[in-house]
């Protein structure tokens, strides 16, 4: 089974994906590293620009029929049996990205993406089996246990559990000002 862990930068994808792979006894695959290994994409600054279709081809070729956990904000665009969309309060995302040294514009862009469900909508356009998990205020272990409970109970689709419009006023400073 290919499980894709996706979400806006700053939601905790890598930590959760590594722990989930460990608990399931699956191979952990960082899509950025995988693309670089395969010689696809181009590094521009801190970002890797890659053709999604080309990456998807290599993912399917390499992992079809195997048990892997894919980690990356493009993983929901890859062939997968189950997509887990991690969500986090936009303010939390802004704070984490600020700590990572993201520019104000990049912080605003990612806060906005989380606010309007960009990754979730893209995942639903590509896949039937999509589970949304709110990571806000939870430890990575709690998130992994929630995912495992959902998988073990046979749930393949759970969406619509996050609505950031209720906190929109609180998020406005983070949209284009990076929290300042």
Swiss-Prot record:
Gene3D superfamilies: P-loop containing nucleotide triphosphate hydrolases. Residues 30-50 are annotated as: NMP. It comes from the Archaea. ATP binds at residues 10, 12-15, 100, 138. Keywords: ATP-binding, Kinase, Nucleotide-binding, Ribosome biogenesis, rRNA processing, Transferase. It catalyses: AMP + ATP = 2 ADP; ATP + H2O = ADP + phosphate + H(+). Pfam families: AAA_18. Residues 99-109 are annotated as: LID. InterPro entries: Adenyl_kinase_AK6, P-loop_NTPase. GO terms for biological process: ribosomal small subunit biogenesis; rRNA processing. Broad-specificity nucleoside monophosphate (NMP) kinase that catalyzes the reversible transfer of the terminal phosphate group between nucleoside triphosphates and monophosphates. Also has ATPase activity. Involved in the late maturation steps of the 30S ribosomal particles, specifically 16S rRNA maturation. While NMP activity is not required for ribosome maturation, ATPase activity is. Associates transiently with small ribosomal subunit protein uS11. ATP hydrolysis breaks the interaction with uS11. PANTHER family: ADENYLATE KINASE ISOENZYME 6 (PTHR12595:SF0), POS9-ACTIVATING FACTOR FAP7-RELATED (PTHR12595). Interacts with uS11. Not a structural component of 40S pre-ribosomes, but transiently interacts with them by binding to uS11. Belongs to the adenylate kinase family. AK6 subfamily. This is Putative adenylate kinase.
């Amino acid at each position: 089974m290919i499980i894709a862990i996706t979400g806006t930068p700053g939601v905790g994808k890598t930590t959760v994906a590594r722990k989930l792979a460990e608990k399931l006894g699956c191979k952990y695959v960082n899509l950025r590293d995988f693309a670089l290994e395969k010689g696809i994409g181009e590094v521009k600054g801190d970002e890797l620009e890659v053709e999604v279709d080309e990456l998807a081809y290599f993912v399917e070729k390499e992992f079809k029929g195997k048990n892997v956990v894919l980690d990356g904000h493009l993983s929901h665009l890859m062939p997968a049996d189950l997509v887990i969309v991690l969500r986090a309060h936009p303010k939390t995302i802004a704070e984490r990205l600020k700590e990572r040294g993201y520019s104000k514009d990049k912080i605003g862009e990612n806060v906005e993406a989380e606010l309007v469900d960009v990754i979730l909508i893209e995942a639903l356009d590509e896949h039937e089996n999509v589970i949304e998990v709110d990571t806000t205020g939870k430890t990575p272990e709690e998130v992994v246990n929630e995912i495992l409970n959902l998988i073990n109970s046979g749930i393949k689709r759970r969406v619509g559990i996050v609505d950031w419009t209720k906190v929109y006023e609180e998020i406005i400073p983070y949209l284009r000002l990076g929290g300042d």
